[in-house]
Amino acid sequence: MTFRSFVLGLSTALFIAGYNHFSDYVVKQGRFISNLMPVAVYGTLLVFLLVINPLLRRLWTKWALTGRELAVIVGFALVACSVPSYGIVECIPTGIMLPKHLQRLEPGWKKIDATAMAPERMLVDVSEDEESYVTDYAKGLAEGDEHISPRQIPWRIWLRPLGFWLPLVLCMAIGTLGLALVFHRQWSRHEQLPYPITRFTRALLPKEGRALGGVFHTRAFWIGFLLIFLVLMNNYMCRWWKDVLIPVRLYLDFRPLNTLVPTLVEGHGLRLLRPTLLFTVIGLAYFLASEVSFSMAFGPFIFCFIAGVLAKYGVVLRTGHHQSVKLESFLFAGGYTGIVLMVFYTGRQYYWSVLKRCFGLRSGDTIAPAAAWGMRVFLVATAGFIAQLIVVGLDWQLAVLYTALCLIIFITVSRTIAETGAFYIGTEVFPGAIIWGFLGATALGPSTMVIMFMVS
């Protein structure tokens, strides 16, 4: 990591965090960060490699960024993508202020004093002037097209909740990064997982002394690139000249055949009969084993068919909202747990050796210092996460169970990305809902459930 790569990476992260809201809600050109492989990052990287980096190399060789430096910058950018959009910015501020607003509007909330069930540290402190603070947040302080000054924001009411939420998020983020150092060697060296997105990125990055990656010198790449570019550009221009150009359909519509597969439709599989051609997915499939691609393609059909069969017997898997107690969530939770158990069993010798080296004990295997330090960071950060849940009122047993479920989700999603390159992953597993379903509302109590669901 060079100094300029650190500065450029940090600047890129700050730009993403600041520009995302403007792009999504002012320009309204679609989600700036739409999935786990954002076009905002990889598209910019492609343009930089094709245009800017060769130009920098022509001006002065040392100005061109190396592959290692670009990897650092991309890493910063990807981490920053977790902050705006669906991440921290859209969830936490609204989640800790909106309950105050809803209590004023909903008679049921007011009758039971719903916000009193949440610990004070988890919500904003509006005791000074609740009417003004809550109304200003709900309606906004800006008038017309005029923007407000940062000084007009009542920062003091946000200090208490942010003092809880930011350390909580940082503990989980730092802990999972440490865990990634532990898993990486086992997954990449011992199990030889394909890492499709990483391999794709590495193919783009230039080697030492070059401005372009090796893939840009391949004729097959340019043929495929130009064909896809022409198709997408034609479809874009069709939005402006609809009467002149003919769009190329990027989907196959088999929905008229739905009467032939009523069981699939009953299992909410109708949209599977209208598959969309995603060129990114097609490209990443070349990095995978054929059986993995086959499983990814036909797995949803099998799941929806089974769901349709169960629905005919009155067993509905998909019902309620995403954090409700439903059978589908428990199916996924069981599957996630099974995957994590398989991961630990497969690398049990390595993980046990890392754990021993973490505490300074000897092990028969050669363990990289980074893995041992990663385990130490993970254990400390996880302990910090559990401690903060206990401080706000969660029993230590539930805090440990909740944290374990969170880690199961992160490990499973990470394993899926490393093994398949899937970048559209919408998990249906929420720790609060799973614990609620297992123990019941009576055993947990309202305050405990509020804490778990707010953290979810």
Show where each model-derived region lies.
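Transmembrane-helix bundle segments that line or gate the permeation/cavity pathway
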Residues: 3-456
